[in-house]
Each structure stands twice: as structure tokens, then as C-alpha cells.
Amino acid sequence: MPRFDIVGQLGSLRRYARSLTRDSADAEDLVHDALVRAYERRGTFRSGGNLRAWLLSIVHNAFIDKMRSRRSEAARVEQAGYLTDASTPAPQEHSVRLAQVREAFFSLPEEQRSALHLVAIEGLSYQEAADASGVPLGTLMSRIGRARAALRGMESAAPAPAKNHLRIVGDPS
């Protein structure tokens, strides 16, 4: 039985779970459930296999199972309402831009958000991400393409930065 470096994978698992659930508490629950499943199914892990990809696929499958068990679409819509931050972001332009990117990312459909997260944030190859998601490679690639196109569309639809219409009055010397 191989030894697992689960602790070294927790950051990736938490980020991916947060990306899927859009809620920190739900993400922690999802990671916990996935780790319990991984422990129970540790015999199915192939020696020499990619532990991170295996664990991420368990997180993904646990998320899908959780979504299937929810009673109605209304419960998911209500859950998404908790995304808004109660705190006001810092006024710096970078902070505002980061909040806009985060909002755009979380507005993507779950399948696109999941695919983009695995490749762009977790750094998995397309094949590893497809395996973790349980979809064919072509499906994953088109989901990523649609996600990127949607984000580009949101970028072009964003209002242009405000121009300074103030006039300097007085002697410039």
C-alpha cells in the first residue's frame, strides 16, 4: 500500500472545492467528504499514478453526487445568493479588478468553471483534467474554450474606465 502525501494536496483540493461550491464552508465539507472517500477507496489508487489528479477527481465526483442529491434548482439558486461579499473591497484598482475577475469566473456555468479551474488554476494537463472530470478530452477542451470566450465577452462588455474630466486651473509653472 503506497503512502499518500494528502497534506501536500490540501491546498489544491480546497481551491478546487471552493471553485465548485462558491462557498468556503461548503468547500471544506466537500474536501472532508472527498478525503473520507479517498481513504475508503485507497486500494483503487494505482501505484505511480498522479495522486493530485486522483484526489481532484474524487472531489469532482463528490461534488456531482452532492448536486444530484439536492432537492430542487431553487435550493441551488438560493445558495448562490450567498456569494456576495458583505465587506467592501479596498479602493485600489487592482482589488477592484480582482473582484471583477472573480465575479466573472463565478458567473460561468459549473461545467465551464470546473474545467477552467482544473487547467488554469490547478495546472493539470487537458488530459488529466478530462480524467478528473470524467469527460472526454474534446468535451473538456470545448468547455474551456467556451469559458474563455465568455470571459473575453464579459471583458469587452465591461464599462471603460472613467476619464478624468477635470481641468487644471492656474499657472502651470
Language-model segments: residues:
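Short, aromatic/basic-enriched loop-to-helix "N-cap" motif that marks the start
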Residues: 11, 43-57, 137
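A short, charge-rich alpha-helical start-of-domain segment used by transcription regulators
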Residues: 1-15, 25-28, 39
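Short, small-hydrophobic-rich alpha-helical interface motif
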Residues: 13, 27-38, 58, 129, ...
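Acidic, proline/glycine-rich intrinsically disordered inter-domain spacer in sigma factors
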Residues: 4, 74-106
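Arg/Lys-rich amphipathic alpha helix in sigma70-family domain 2
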Residues: 46, 57-78, 93-94, 153
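A short pre-motif secondary-structure segment
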Residues: 115-119
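DNA-recognition helix of helix-turn-helix
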Residues: 133-160
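Σ70-family region 2.3-2.4 aromatic/basic alpha-helix that recognizes the −10 promoter
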Residues: 35-39, 49-69, 144, 148
